[in-house]
Amino acid sequence: MAVGNERRGLSIRTLERADETLVIPTQSRTVRTLNVAAAAAVAGWYVLRGSGPQAHARRPDVRRPALLIVGSDHVEVGSSFRSAAAFGFRDVLLDDRGAGWFGGSAATRREARGAARRHKNPLRVHRATMADLARFDDVLVVLESGKQIPLQAKRVARGRRQLVVVGLGGDDVDKLPAASIEVASLGLAAGVSAPLRFVASITLAEIARQVGRRRRGPPGVPAPKFEAAVKLRTPEDVVFVDPSRLLSY
């Protein structure tokens, strides 16, 4: 499996040798690529687990859930924000546990915003805590591994009253009110901690698949095509004939 560089992509020679080509369908007009390692994680996850077709909807934005990212590393959080923007999110909640996104040093904020491609990323980041889970009717926590229901089997296109949480560990979930949340798993290898940007990017890709793209409307009436057109002559070349004169013929 070959994954293209985010700036140059794959070479023509490599593409010509490919048996299959997979395109990750980003939905942003400004952030159109993922971090290359995150893209490899998304591609590898779908290659191993398969995928249904991407949905089509009249109003995909209405189906997109809210997203809460829990993170302590500023670069991982920034890369996750980049993926969120690429997959069509405009707002994200952040439980900042030392990532310094809101109050870190200038160097930390600069690195985090660089990872998020902040210069062209219109994403709005809102400060949040675990107490904010109570504001939502439906909360789904996504873990990187475990025996929980696979993420593909969960519906993650229920709109803004649904919250998807990424970045919590199994121990954190045990401290939450069990009756108020559901838990899904990506099914990654146990015992190996995956970076936050991998877990977030895979989750965001599955959300984008279920939320879908805008359904195209009926095609418009095509403009008429002409094989020839009348070319108007100058007034000097025009002879006006009175209809009464034609009666003499």
What is the predicted role of each segment?
Residues 1-26, 52, 145-187:
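Active-site/ligand-binding-proximal alpha/beta "capping" segment
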Residues 5, 71, 190:
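Conserved residues at beta->alpha junctions
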Residues 9-10, 75, 194-195:
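Residues that form or flank phosphate/diphosphate-binding pockets in enzymes
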Residues 13-16, 34, 79, 198:
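Generic recognition of short, well-ordered alpha-helical segments
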Residues 27-34, 189-194:
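Glycine-rich, Arg-bearing micro-motifs that act as flexible, cationic patches
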Residues 36-39:
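A glycine-rich, Thr/Ser-enriched phosphate-binding loop motif common to dinucleotide/cofactor-binding enzymes
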Residues 41-145, 200-249:
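RNA substrate-binding interface of SAM-dependent RNA methyltransferases
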